[in-house]
Amino acid sequence: MIEQIVSEPQIKILNSFKHINLFLAGVGSGKTHLGGIKSYQLIKKYPLVRGFIAANTYLQLTQSTLFRMREYWKSIGVNEYNKDTKPSGQYVVNKKPPSCFRTDNHNFDDYYGIISFKNGCVIFTGSMDRAESHSGKEFGWAILDEVKDTEAEDIKEYILTRLRQQGIFVKDGKLSNSGDPFNPIYFLTSPAKEEWINEWFKLDQYIDEIASLIYSDKTYFYKEFDDKCI
């Protein structure tokens, strides 16, 4: 068994059954590591539910977000497939999957911007600086990394409206194959310049409480309200 170190704030997000989740933290806090954990949890349990992973820019996506997430996947034995050097690999990136992968649920002319897993799971990837390119996609879960500078309207129009594929459910406080439909989105980002994060999550209402907690390595701010988790 591979032992994984997870912080209390990360555990709160991992265990959240709110549809809209925010992990707001500084550099080195494990934001993208958290994304790696959550993404593979969903990939493994719901192989027929498509996911979406994005960052604010393409360079952020390729050089930071996916790099860190794939590092996590590798740490638990989930490697990229290569016919010659890693035939036991479990995913391919931007290419047609090999015949040993499940693809009966695929219907793509081109696999650019797609991560395909051996169990059939598909993850769309992209950047939010070309948000309109995600129009028409449909997925069941989403992870948005470092999108603090992304405009709120782009997220509402091109992401939240696409977050509607069925297949993930919550029952008795656990992920399930039946029960209440669940389409979670996770924002993993550092403090925002755009006001939409403060407004969506009502952070201005908790300024004093936040200030009293965030400057210690032993405490953190946590709140659930409506359909949101911070």
Please state what every model-predicted region is:
Residues 1-230:
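Phosphate/NTP-binding elements of NTP-utilizing enzymes
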